[in-house]
């Protein structure tokens, strides 16, 4: 059995075995489960109540153990693991505060983003010490390259933080974030292979594919467990950093188009509401609810319908990226 196959099945099987025990453990220590926003679609208040969160612990454990055993400790893999675990810690604190207060509010958005950016910027600055001037260059598409020079570290940190929070926003329906994560890691792993990136980055993608697939088994509608911020923030950061390490940050925006759309829907909604409130005295909304997957729920789409259609969009965009933009 070759190394990629061994890593995939190890992460998948370990996650599949660990998940049921972890779900039972979470139900014992937290009977209320993940707090649900009162403004959420009505069915969420019924179907998602008392569902345990922090399932990201299973994904991270199942992913990182094979890396620890079989993947060489290159600068790339050390940075990936360090950033992923750092963002997992931020997510854990956020989840813990929510569960403790039995509220959907944890760390404030400003505090969370500030800590994330500092962590990512420090990580990228230290990593730069291992590389030549090519580190500051990135590909746009079709071999076109741009050099960010001294601005590259902040740019890379922005990608990591943006990806982290975009995945967090997407994690609002059963199976939605997990399917998008799997599709994105498959695409980034394929791009990494085709561009002859460091093998450790490819193996990193493979182990997260296996672990997230096993989690998805228990996260499909009706979900038995949610990944929580400890999962979405850390895995989102891992996705963004993977695109940075293979120098395909711009292409990641196409591959992860759903993450981009989810984030933009929130930004547009907030800005439009503030603008109309300032101009007319009363705020107006463009969407029924954001992130945009909730808008489609309010329109009458089922959770599974949204998850599958969003996945189709991601697959089409990924194929387009590999076929025409790489």
UniProtKB/Swiss-Prot annotation:
Keyword RNA-binding: no
Primary role: Catalyzes the initial step of the lipid cycle reactions in the biosynthesis of the cell wall peptidoglycan: transfers peptidoglycan precursor phospho-MurNAc-pentapeptide from UDP-MurNAc-pentapeptide onto the lipid carrier undecaprenyl phosphate, yielding undecaprenyl-pyrophosphoryl-MurNAc-pentapeptide, known as lipid I.
Enzyme Commission code: 2.7.8.13
Keyword annotations: Cell cycle, Cell division, Cell membrane, Cell shape, Cell wall biogenesis/degradation, Magnesium, Membrane, Metal-binding, Peptidoglycan synthesis, Transferase, Transmembrane, Transmembrane helix
Species assigned in the record: Wolbachia sp. subsp. Brugia malayi (strain TRS)
Superkingdom classification of source: Bacteria
Coiled coil location: none
GO biological process terms held by the UniProt record: cell division; cell wall organization; peptidoglycan biosynthetic process; regulation of cell shape
Principal location listed in the UniProt entry: membrane
Catalytically driven reaction(s): UDP-N-acetyl-alpha-D-muramoyl-L-alanyl-gamma-D-glutamyl-meso-2,6-diaminopimeloyl-D-alanyl-D-alanine + di-trans,octa-cis-undecaprenyl phosphate = di-trans,octa-cis-undecaprenyl diphospho-N-acetyl-alpha-D-muramoyl-L-alanyl-D-glutamyl-meso-2,6-diaminopimeloyl-D-alanyl-D-alanine + UMP
Name of the molecule in the record: Phospho-N-acetylmuramoyl-pentapeptide-transferase
Transmembrane segments: 3-23, 51-71, 77-97, 113-133, 143-163, 175-195, 199-219, 225-245, 250-270, 306-326
UniProt subcellular location: Cell membrane
Membrane topology: Multi-pass membrane protein
Similarity comment: Belongs to the glycosyltransferase 4 family. MraY subfamily.
GO cellular component entries: plasma membrane
Pathway assignment: Cell wall biogenesis; peptidoglycan biosynthesis
Gene Ontology molecular-function annotations: metal ion binding; phospho-N-acetylmuramoyl-pentapeptide-transferase activity; UDP-N-acetylmuramoyl-L-alanyl-D-glutamyl-meso-2,6-diaminopimelyl-D-alanyl-D-alanine:undecaprenyl-phosphate transferase activity
